[in-house]
């Protein structure tokens, strides 16, 4: 695993990488799951503080606003697919199972979201909501080779791999 008391610069770096990968994994997971929860009213009704949608119907309308260039008939399907993807990615990242793949797909999903936000609402929208930063973080997580406190780590350790 890793030592909690670094004895040299390499140990300190390993601790920082391990902490960062766990922190980033959880931050992305909870961000995906929180956004999904908002669509189903878990955080309250539309108009309440920190509630973006409050209902799935409002999220579908927002999906249509961002994807104005797509045929209207595809918007509900896109909203459902993106919600399913965010739910699955959120749980995969939370558990640390197939972490690299989940992080890569999460980075792509967030990048597409940032691009459509910029096209529909202007460049400040994805910048103000740190969507490009989250996408970059997901891509960085996908580049990690170790995932402490994860199913991936448990599976690797139980298989005897180094």
Predicted regions and their residues:
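Extended, low-polarity transmembrane helix blocks
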Residues: 1-58, 65-68, 72-88, 95-162
């Amino acid at each position: 695993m890793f030592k909690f008391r670094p004895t040299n610069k390499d140990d300190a770096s390993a601790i920082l990488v391990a902490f960062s990968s766990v922190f980033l994994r959880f931050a992305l997971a909870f961000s995906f799951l929180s956004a999904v929860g908002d669509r189903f009213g878990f955080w309250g009704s539309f108009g309440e503080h920190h509630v973006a949608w409050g209902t799935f119907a409002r999220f579908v309308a927002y999906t249509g606003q961002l994807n104005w260039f797509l045929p209207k008939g595809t918007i509900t399907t896109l909203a459902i697919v993106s919600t399913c993807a965010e739910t699955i990615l959120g749980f995969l990242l939370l558990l640390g199972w197939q972490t690299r793949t989940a992080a890569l797909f999460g980075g792509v999903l967030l990048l597409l979201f940032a691009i459509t936000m910029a096209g529909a609402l202007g460049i400040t929208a994805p910048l103000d909501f740190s969507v490009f930063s989250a996408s970059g973080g997901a891509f960085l997580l996908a580049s990690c080779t170790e995932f402490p406190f994860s199913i991936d780590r448990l599976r690797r350790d139980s298989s005897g791999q180094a």
